[in-house]
């Protein structure tokens, strides 16, 4: 084998036939550098991946799973706890609708004897007005207080005061039709005294004259007569003026009533009732002795003479 054949370069790839030997060498060197750089990159990426996997603790995955499950369970328990709090929490303030809650109606089983009842009375044509009201008071057993009236009447008999001082009153019979201007009075059923019943009327004539007085005879209605009145069940008969003894008795009775009311409200016993009776007897004998036992509110409402108030000094305790 000659020297020429021994000096030939090693075999080469067919894809490098078009390259110059110098360029071929550079191309091979570049490929080697690229392959070496690719190996380095692969090694670096693998090292980073291993380092990252090493940095991540497996326990963290389990704890993270637990943490992820814990909020869910916490949400459920929180929801349950919230529901329990909503059920067991005591409401504060006024209940809804309690302010506007309808109150039960007040039912009065019977009327009070001292209550006033209003009446509108219509007297038919041709009837006696005074007689009709008197019969109504007697049958209903109620006192009647006439407030006003309107309509027309005929053939009126009234009593007028004397025009001359000291002279007797005169009775006047009025014939014809008269318009009622004013009507007032009261009617009490028996056994009330007759003086407690009476009717006063003022009339206007056809020519403009005005006449009035106390009705002492028939008062015939000329057409419907409407009367506005009030009725009552009880009436206390008082004789005025009051005497001094009566005033003292009424004062003692008022104090005794206040004491009775306080004892009744406090649930007094029979012993308290006897004590109150003894106090009433003592008050009747010596009116000045009850001053020391009165509270200030009663002292303000009771009017006493000077000698009764300053009669005896307050005893020392």
From Swiss-Prot:
Database matches in SUPFAM superfamilies: AF0104/ALDC/Ptd012-like
Keyword hit for Nucleus: yes
Ranges of compositional bias, category Gly residues: 72-84
One Pfam family of this chain: PCC
Gene Ontology terms describing biological process: flower development; photomorphogenesis; skotomorphogenesis; vegetative to reproductive phase transition of meristem
Residue ranges, annotated region (Disordered): 22-41, 48-106, 258-285
Any single Gene Ontology cellular-component annotation: nucleus
Record-annotated PPC domain positions: 113-253
Keyword Nucleus: yes
InterPro entries, per database record: AHL15-29, PPC_dom
Residue ranges: DNA binding: 89-101
Primary localization class, coarse: nucleus
Tissue expression profile of the protein: Expressed at the hypocotyl-root transition zone and the root hair zone. Also detected in the inflorescence.
Annotated keywords: DNA-binding, Flowering, Nucleus, Transcription, Transcription regulation
Compositional bias ranges of the Basic and acidic residues kind: 48-64
Segments of skewed composition (Low complexity): 26-35, 270-282
Protein's cellular compartments: Nucleus
Listed GO MF terms: histone deacetylase binding; minor groove of adenine-thymine-rich DNA binding
Null mutant phenotype: Slightly longer hypocotyls.
Matches recorded under PANTHER family: AT-HOOK MOTIF NUCLEAR-LOCALIZED PROTEIN 15 (PTHR31100), AT-HOOK MOTIF NUCLEAR-LOCALIZED PROTEIN 18-RELATED (PTHR31100:SF2)
Record function comment: Transcription factor that specifically binds AT-rich DNA sequences related to the nuclear matrix attachment regions (MARs). Binds an AT-rich DNA sequences in the FLOWERING LOCUS T (FT) promoter. Acts redundantly with AHL18, AHL27 and AHL29 in the regulation of flowering and regulation of the hypocotyl elongation. Plays a role in both photo- and skotomorphogenesis. Acts as a chromatin remodeling factor that modifies the architecture of FLOWERING LOCUS T (FT) chromatin by modulating both H3 acetylation and methylation leading to the regulation of FT expression during flowering induction.
Subunit composition and interactions: Homodimer. Interacts with HDA1/HDA19, HDA6 and HDA9.
Domain writeup: The PPC domain mediates interactions between AHL proteins.
Note from the entry: Overexpression of AHL22 results in delayed flowering and inhibition of hypocotyl growth.
Entry protein name: AT-hook motif nuclear-localized protein 22
Upper lineage: Eukaryota, Viridiplantae, Streptophyta, Embryophyta, Tracheophyta
